[in-house]
Amino acid sequence: MEALVYTFLLVSTLGILFFAIFFREPPRVTPKGGK
C-alpha cells in the first residue's frame, strides 16, 4: 500500500509543478490567434 501512496504523491507533485510552470509562462508554441 505504501508504494501506491508514494506513487500518488509523486504524480500529484509533478502535476502541481507542471501546472505552476505552465500557467506562470504561457506556451509560446501556440500562436496568439489560436485558442
Swiss-Prot record:
Leader sequence segment: none
The UniProt record lists the keyword DNA damage: no
Domain of life of the source: Eukaryota
Pfam families on file: PsbT
UniProt KW keywords: Chloroplast, Membrane, Photosynthesis, Photosystem II, Plastid, Thylakoid, Transmembrane, Transmembrane helix
Recorded GO CC terms: chloroplast thylakoid membrane; photosystem II reaction center
InterPro entries hit by this protein: PSII_PsbT, PSII_PsbT_sf
The keyword Lipid biosynthesis belongs to this UniProt entry's keyword annotation: no
Transmembrane segments: 3-23
Cellular localization per UniProt: Plastid, Chloroplast thylakoid membrane
GO biological process: photosynthesis
Topology of this chain in the membrane: Single-pass membrane protein
Family that this chain belongs to: Belongs to the PsbT family.
Role of this protein: Found at the monomer-monomer interface of the photosystem II (PS II) dimer, plays a role in assembly and dimerization of PSII. PSII is a light-driven water plastoquinone oxidoreductase, using light energy to abstract electrons from H(2)O, generating a proton gradient subsequently used for ATP formation.
Subunit structure: PSII is composed of 1 copy each of membrane proteins PsbA, PsbB, PsbC, PsbD, PsbE, PsbF, PsbH, PsbI, PsbJ, PsbK, PsbL, PsbM, PsbT, PsbY, PsbZ, Psb30/Ycf12, at least 3 peripheral proteins of the oxygen-evolving complex and a large number of cofactors. It forms dimeric complexes.
Entry protein name: Photosystem II reaction center protein T
Protein's organism: Gnetum gnemon
Lineage, top ranks: Eukaryota, Viridiplantae, Streptophyta, Embryophyta, Tracheophyta
